[in-house]
């Protein structure tokens, strides 16, 4: 059965809008000193689930029940769904009868948005169902929807269909007016006097990652005449947010090598990226950004909630050629 990808794109954007609005309502409903949204709700095999995550999970469950077309049976893979308990839509559909696998990160950037510090992102991708063999490279439609802080009036949305480019717009969350916007990744061919960095959000492995980054920049851009090379960083604790910063031209290169570092240290830590964190990477590629494994080769993990993912995004091909190993 062939499904119009434009229909899928609109459905996933609608779902992202629903999550955005529910999260905004929840933030407005609590006082500034109420930390219930930042309270740990439970621990999953993939991540820590906070109070604010429960709001998005409930919104997603009700949205799928009401709006997802019954003739498009899917397997739903998302943060909070245990690997041994697959969820299908419509509920009760045998896994073998699903046509697609839909992978979601309802709130990518929970730790920032739950303190009203910085935007989080709703991320989604849909791929033809291949069971355990379904991979990131199979994603045909991907969307990102910004979940803004309470002081923001604008929230952006990006959606891509493989081979058809991307559609970008902004939503005025006060009036609901939508306007198309243009995203243009940086055309810079080096990182000097721009934002470029390797992610190191948590204490584990931080010193090693910092050393690797320092050695990278010193190798590429040696100090001359006693003057240090100038490169900025912005540790945006949201993979979707990092992707967006590259898409807008704000950041030139971002890498996340935590799984590689943890493996070197002999650590089994869930504090790293998983496939749902990078499920919108198709959008970057459709807009000319180079997204790949940090050691080279395609970014291509299974569509599950537990596999560790290392990635790097370069704003353009010339920049990638000048930096990648």
Task: Briefly describe each language-model feature range.
Residues 29-31, 65-73, 128-134, 149-150, ...:
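Alpha-helix termini
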Residues 9, 47-55, 114-117, 237-240, ...:
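Short, conserved micro-motifs enriched in small and acidic residues
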Residues 44-49, 108-112, 229-233, 269-270:
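A short glycine/serine-rich beta->alpha loop
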Residues 54-59, 70-76, 122, 241-257:
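Conserved long hydrophobic alpha-helices within structured protein cores
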Residues 12, 16-19, 23, 27, ...:
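An extended, acidic
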Residues 60, 64, 122, 126, ...:
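Buried hydrophobic packing segments
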Residues 1-107, 318-319, 324:
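N-terminal subdomain of lithium-sensitive/metallo-dependent phosphomonoesterases centered on the IMPase/IPPase/PAP
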Residues 95-163:
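DPxDG-like acidic metal-binding loop motif
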């Amino acid at each position: 059965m062939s499904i119009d990808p434009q229909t899928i794109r609109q459905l996933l954007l609608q779902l992202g809008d629903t999550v955005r609005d529910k999260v905004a309502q929840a933030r407005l409903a609590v006082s500034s000193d109420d930390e219930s949204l930042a309270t740990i709700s439970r621990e999953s095999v993939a991540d820590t689930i906070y109070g604010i995550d429960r709001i998005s999970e409930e919104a997603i469950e009700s949205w799928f029940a009401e709006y997802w077309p019954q003739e498009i049976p899917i397997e739903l893979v998302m943060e909070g769904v245990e690997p041994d308990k697959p969820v299908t839509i419509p509920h009760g559909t045998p896994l073998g009868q699903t046509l697609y696998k839909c992978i979601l990160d309802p709130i990518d950037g929970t730790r920032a948005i739950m303190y009203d510090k910085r935007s989080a992102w709703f991320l989604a991708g849909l791929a033809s169902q291949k069971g355990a063999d379904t991979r990131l490279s199979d994603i045909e439609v991907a969307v990102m929807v910004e979940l803004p802080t309470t002081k923001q009036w604008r929230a952006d949305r990006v959606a891509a269909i493989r081979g058809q480019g991307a559609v970008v717009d902004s939503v005025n969350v006060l009036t609901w007016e939508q306007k198309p916007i243009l995203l243009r990744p940086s055309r810079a061919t080096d990182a000097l006097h721009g934002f470029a960095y390797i992610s190191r959000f948590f204490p584990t492995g931080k010193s090693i990652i910092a050393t690797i980054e320092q050695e990278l920049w010193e190798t590429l851009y040696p100090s001359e005449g006693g003057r240090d090379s100038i490169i900025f960083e912005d540790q945006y604790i949201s993979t979707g947010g990092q992707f967006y910063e590259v898409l807008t031209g704000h950041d030139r290169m971002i890498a996340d090598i935590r799984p590689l570092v943890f493996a070197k240290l002999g650590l089994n830590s869930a504090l790293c990226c998983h496939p749902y964190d990078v499920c919108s990477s198709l959008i970057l590629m459709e807009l000319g950004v180079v997204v790949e494994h940090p050691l080279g080769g395609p970014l291509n993990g299974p569509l599950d909630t537990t596999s560790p993912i290392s990635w790097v995004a370069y704003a353009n091909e010339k920049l990638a050629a000048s930096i990648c190993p």
